[in-house]
Amino acid sequence: MADGPVAELLLRRLEASDGGLDSAELAAELGMEHQAVVGAVKSLQALGEVIEAELRSTKRWELTAEGEEIAREGSHEARVFRSIPPEGLAQSELMRLPSGKVGFSKAMSNKWIRVDKSAADGPRVFRVVDSMEDEVQRRLQLVRGGQAEKLGEKERSELRKRKLLAEVILKTYWVSKGSAFSTSISKQETELSPEMISSGSWRDRPFKPYNFLAHGVLPDSGHLHPLLKVRSQFRQIFLEMGFTEMPTDNFIESSFWNFDALFQPQQHPARDQHDTFFLRDPAEALQLPMDYVQRVKRTHSQGGYGSQGYKYNWKLDEARKNLLRTHTTSASARALYRLAQKKPFTPVKYFSIDRVFRNETLDATHLAEFHQIEGVVADHGLTLGHLMGVLREFFTKLGITQLRFKPAYNPYTEPSMEVFSYHQGLKKWVEVGNSGVFRPEMLLPMGLPENVSVIAWGLSLERPTMIKYGINNIRELVGHKVNLQMVYDSPLCRLDAEPRPPPTQEAA
């Protein structure tokens, strides 16, 4: 039977009626939810011409939750009036009543009460009239009794303004008998089973029409991984600071752009196979800007631009070796080289957030593939002070305000600084980034003007994400062992939104 007992009741009531039934009135008579009757109507409609149902919309007035309370207990102003004894009541005490603030204002405008500000113990409230009529309660009781039409438009408007009354649209069905009306309806099949097909019984069974407009179950999708959430926050911060995103689609990079262009010598330990993934095929880069390559070679082997260089035999074959980039600073080098070819020079602010690769032993805190965040600013006369100022602005936007700087060494920056922040959870200072001013030996061979300085800084994406989501093992954040439920449940993350002052001890 379509929709079970409710549909049966509907058909029996419809058989006994002369013209038809209103679904809302039927629900009230049967003492059930209107939606249950509507469901039965729609189920019977699916059977064909058993019934006819006309959708009707009617407007009516209903009391809000506050309006229901006032209809029972009286208006706020009436309650305030009744609470004032003949000798008056201190205004401060009156305001502490649940209806005090609203009721006092309305009672004053109705001229039911007055305030004597000359009283010794402070302003005191007295009655002005001996009695009053609570018109608000009376009007609301009329609405509750189904007599809202007795109220004028002005009275209804006043009640709506006080959010005591609401106009609602009630959608009901007027149900009448159809051309194929019957009180005994056979059950319609909703599934075609293998047994029906093999026996041929499907030919004699009625099937429920397929509803192509029905909404199916929405697929469980749209959950952002914690790394993507934090990455979006970093990216938004850079954009708010006026930075432009660099192209970082070169996962495979030549040793020239990854190392040599950064004034990193060819015998540096970082270029060893134990730290870098070198490619077997294609093993070498075929296209390099040879005029720039020659300037880099001369700087490495002979010096120049105020530098003695490294005094070794620089080899082009070594620079051609392809690898998986170990940092996104190679993308910064490419961007700065393109900038140097544009005349005249224009100050820029670049950033990038992308993956890098290191030949490291995998453990709870290290991966062979991770994300690097990098910011670069190029302008005339930039100094270490500018770098520290930009770093403070950047990390403050992250919610990290307690910063310390420690001198460090990088092959391609001088001076260089490590950035530390006090971590409340670990109760100690932790490194959150590295920074520095790019060396002239890196910038001048590109063709940048001598009075142009470039400040830069970088940090990983995984470390702050692990800290903020309370993850101790990086393999729980990235990789095939990640619990997808963690991705579904993870909330939006704000980095140290309410930082606290750190202790006074120096960073280690």
Curated annotation (Swiss-Prot):
Organism this protein belongs to: Pongo abelii (Sumatran orangutan)
Residues bearing PTM N-acetylalanine: A2
Cofactors: Mg(2+)
GO molecular function, one term: tRNA binding
Enzyme Commission numbers on file: 6.1.1.20
GO biological process, one term: phenylalanyl-tRNA aminoacylation
One matching Pfam family: tRNA-synt_2d
Residues annotated for L-phenylalanine binding in this entry: T329, Q372, I373, E374, Y412, F438
Modified residue annotations for Phosphoserine: S193, S301
Protein name listed in UniProt: Phenylalanine--tRNA ligase alpha subunit
Subunit-level organization: Heterotetramer; dimer of two heterodimers formed by FARSA and FARSB.
Entry GO terms, CC: cytoplasm; cytosol; phenylalanine-tRNA ligase complex
Taxonomic path: Eukaryota, Metazoa, Chordata, Craniata, Vertebrata
N6-acetyllysine: residues carrying this PTM: K311
Chain sites annotated for binding Mg(2+): E414
Keyword Protease: no
